[in-house]
Amino acid sequence: MKNFCIREAEELAADAFGAAHAFLMVGGTTSSVQSMVLTACKRGDEIILPRNVHRSVLNALVLCGAVPVYVNPEVDKRLGISLGMKREQVAKAIKEHPNAVAVLVNNPTYYGICSDLRAIVKMAHDAGMLCLADEAHGTHFYFGGGLPVSAMAAGADMASVSMHKSGGSLTQSSLLLIGPNVHQGYVRQIINLTQTTSGSYLLI
């Protein structure tokens, strides 16, 4: 996607979302999540993540050969839904798996539950790990007051944002946001592995 119009659109998106760079994705947030995980992990690497991640995360682990370290969120018995990852759970996983390369967080979960993202980002960075956020249901966090913190505002390294779920765009359109410490060129190479090089301009 070297087209000037697309490059300008990516720059405008990055500015709007407070990211160092934004990539326009046309394979749904599945392709965005997979690119995010494949960027962070190689074969044999460990990644800390909640048990209730989207299947696109698990499929990415199959592709790259990374090893999941699961954190089991508590369940709200009255509502019957999984909650977010507790800080104590994440800290324990980091301590027990100091060689893990990343921590992945749902921000929010399918049911709108958020973890303490700022604290988790700090714990990950203090341990030399990346922090990735699946924000398939959190696009609105970037554009409203009184809402939970967005991944980029919390200092996360990468975030997958589903524009078509909560941003009003056509189905399959998504964004992959990266922070300043992630190599833009390497991410672009990974994206070329996970989505078409002939993206629909209707989706873009």
Q: Predicted regions: what is each one?
A:
Residues A16-A19, T29-I204:
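Conserved PLP-enzyme active-site core in the AAT-like
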